[in-house]
Design a protein with these regions (language model features):
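Loop-to-transmembrane-helix entry motif
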Residues: 60, 122-125, 220-224, 265, ...
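Hydrophobic transmembrane alpha-helices and their immediate junctions
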Residues: 129, 220-266, 286, 290-291, ...
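Transmembrane alpha-helices of multi-pass inner-membrane enzymes
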Residues: 135-136, 234, 264-322
Length: 332
């Protein structure tokens, strides 16, 4: 799976290829979120929305977080496309995707939505208006969802009575014990009855970590977790640098928008992933790869003193200038 991430670094060399990659990502996940949103509306939210079988996002929780990660990319495509009907379609996709997240009845996704909503509000220039709209939208959704959804969301406050939540806490403690005993962790196949009998507080609750952080901690130890967090932190820094470099450059507005939306995707992953085993899911690694490409392009042009308007995601002025950055961009 991770081979495709390296191919992203090698093959994505211009605006057209990067936008095509984003379209593939959006359509791959958006297909399931679109029909999931329709399903939720037709059934009144009485059933869970699941992803494609035998995939990383087959369960409802994983699909919901993946949808939250893709929705900012939908916003990016909505903003850059010049075609009216494509914008209408992307607007509908955003609406149904949001509904599908609620329809997943995922408690982790609810927390991720809160984190994403707060980040959007924090970065908004019209905080009063955006805050009002967020409250109205949340109120409408809460009124629409059935009692079973409300009961499941309220169980967040009474996690001690939830067997699933207590199993996760048992697995998290197992991860800490393994990392404390083994410098580089116990490997990818450590989630077994034999290992839980040695390291878990309750050896009878053999359960996956359901957390990107504790999963990496058990698999690779404290060193692996530090490296994992460092990669996420560096990706965030790359995007922040792109945002700063393109802030006052109208010709680089698309790069600025993409960097900001990728940060929202990372917020969704880091918050929602705290309760899901998606450490090796390829989507966040593609986002990290794109952040490397964007930052490398701007950093290299600053070093050689070139005009930033020839960035990988430049704002097109004319067909002749639209694909000026055809020069191969080596991976970072």
């Amino acid at each position: 799976i991770q081979v495709m991430t390296f191919l992203t670094l090698i093959l994505i060399i211009d605006e057209k290829k990067l936008n095509l990659l984003i379209w593939v990502i959006v359509l791959s996940v958006g297909f399931f979120s679109f029909k999931g949103g329709i399903f939720t509306l037709m059934t009144g939210g009485a059933f869970h929305v699941f992803g494609p079988p035998a995939s990383y996002i087959s369960e409802n929780n994983a699909l919901a977080v993946a949808v939250l990660m893709v929705m900012p990319l939908m916003v990016y495509l909505y903003r850059i496309t010049p075609h009216k009907w494509v914008r209408y379609g992307m607007g509908c996709a955003l609406f149904f995707s949001l509904i599908s997240v609620f329809g997943s009845q995922s408690r982790g996704a609810l927390l991720a939505m809160a984190a994403v909503g707060f980040f959007f509000w924090l970065k908004s220039k019209t905080k009063i208006l955006s805050g009002f709209l967020l409250v109205i939208a949340a109120s409408l959704v809460f009124a629409f969802m059935p009692q079973s959804w409300h009961e499941r969301m309220e169980s967040i406050q009474t996690y001690e009575e939830d067997e699933s939540a207590m199993s996760r806490i048992n697995s998290w403690q197992y991860s800490i014990n393994v990392a404390n005993d083994r410098l580089t962790g116990a490997g990818l196949q450590s989630w077994s009855k034999q290992m839980f009998a040695i390291y878990a507080p309750n050896p009878n609750q053999v359960f996956v970590a359901h957390s990107i952080y504790f999963s990496v901690l058990a698999d690779h130890g404290w060193l692996g977790l530090i490296l994992f967090l460092s990669v996420l932190g560096l990706a965030w820094r790359n995007l922040t640098q792109v945002i700063k470099r393109t802030k006052n450059d109208p010709d680089s507005s698309h790069s600025n928008l993409l960097a900001r939306m990728l940060q929202v995707s990372l917020i969704a992953y880091m918050s929602g992933g705290a309760f899901l085993s998606l450490s090796y899911f390829d989507l966040p690694w593609h986002i990290i790869a794109i952040s490397v490409l964007l930052n490398y392009q701007f950093a290299s042009r600053e070093v050689v003193g070139l005009d930033l308007s020839s960035d990988i995601i430049q704002r097109p002025k004319a067909p002749a200038n639209r694909m000026r950055s055809q020069q191969r961009m080596p991976p970072n």
